[in-house]
């Protein structure tokens, strides 16, 4: 049987189809769990603000204490779990006993270490609060320590949850870990609901340091910890179904953690450096709350770390749903290209990820920026002044939110090459920036500190992209920059149009007047969001089509594939008919292209050449797709020359399409672009000509790249 027939049989076999359907259902189930968990997380945050108030010293104190368990776990043990334990669990799961003996010993060791760590940290709660806060008075310090004692036991359950999640994932059970956080949020929401029912909302009954009691602490901090406990306990149900026979086992010599720790040492250092810098920034973020607690009644509102926390959750949401998911899928493609030493394939995967994710990330940034006012009012517990504080902070963060996803996608390239050292250098530079910036920020007026920290995050996002791009150029030669800029410019045009449309809608709701309808109450703010957001999205998608942003199709294809399945008589993809003047591609090329269309990460779409601002900056180009000239005659095997012989009137530069003027000379913009993006080995070379043969048959490229 020929290779082409084998490929067709593999693609169309019932087993393959059933496997793809099963994977699709599992992926949809996990995505649904993640989305529901995110939604409930924002419901929990909204209830917390409704119960305690956004500009409340109690809220700032609780947010700081409730963040400590997660920060301590990530600082001390999070890097160990990700860099050391996960590879060992995956390796052990392939053993004849499915890793039962090894995992039992590992879980016994992890439980003992995490329990000891949690006990020590909880006993040292007063010292930890002093180290992570600044300017707290006696009453606020006492409440902070109380909150910490209730919240710090979460460290143990975070560690156990992380370990159980990896054991389940290693055995193919992915959904439980995605759905368990939903129960966590429901428990916390239940506690906050009881709080509002018993003690009233902050709007009608302000809760202060003076009138706070033990029952209130239990309903807020106690239920927060209870949610984490229930979340972890639920994972024992699917774990029991695996029938691994796990039990306490001692004796850890020869387990192999030492060798794994050496491999993951750079990843561990990256985690430690980033978390230490973050802890210091959070310490500075507590200053405004301390100043507000000691300020006389009637003082102007000051944004505290609760404002920064809510704004950070909102700005991180698009990245966590879109970019993380896409990067997870693309990482396999990057890893294969790295293993094959395929620089071109690695560059194509990165370019595909940066362009495809940007379709959603650019809109998300524009939406957060334009809708910052109603979002702030919705989370303000009915206080317009507090809503304005959140709106300003969110606007600052939204400006550079795409850079967060860009840098994350870039670092996947390093990890695919098993290079954890370069991300450490990037994180080290960011840590230095955060430490120096936070040290300077503490001397600003209290009302400006949170805004300055948000600005510091934005500067860090930009710096991380620049540093990562610098190191990536040494690996990839160039980053497919013109094509990426081409797509980003088009998306930017669509984003501007969407922003103007949303601005008009918000103007109708009175967003730009202090007495406007939007600022009357939270219901008015929510109504304006529900009207403006769909209008902005519709305008954005329409303009993406107008500007021929092909990446929209690549982003939507895997999403629509979950709901739209071809009938038995339909083909998954249909190759367009070739013009009569162009030879038809061989059948194996059509089959290969059809197979690539089924994989959302495999396609490298053609990019239209007209951006308006930067005409003909780049064309869609990869080793399998070349643009043929309109008139050419074959000269030899697979090569061609312009009719009439001689040189082409429009020279070809390097291996990208280049903007040229009508007389064939390159513009200053093109010269600058080539100097900025192209490495010395790929600078324009006069006299080279574009390959004029059929797609995928360029003899100047190795067969494995065609």
Question: For the regions a protein language model found, what residue spans apply to each?
Answer:
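Long, low-complexity, intrinsically disordered segments
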Residues: 610-706
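Membrane-embedded alpha-helical bundles of multi-pass transporters/translocases
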Residues: 1-593, 597-598, 602, 612-617, ...
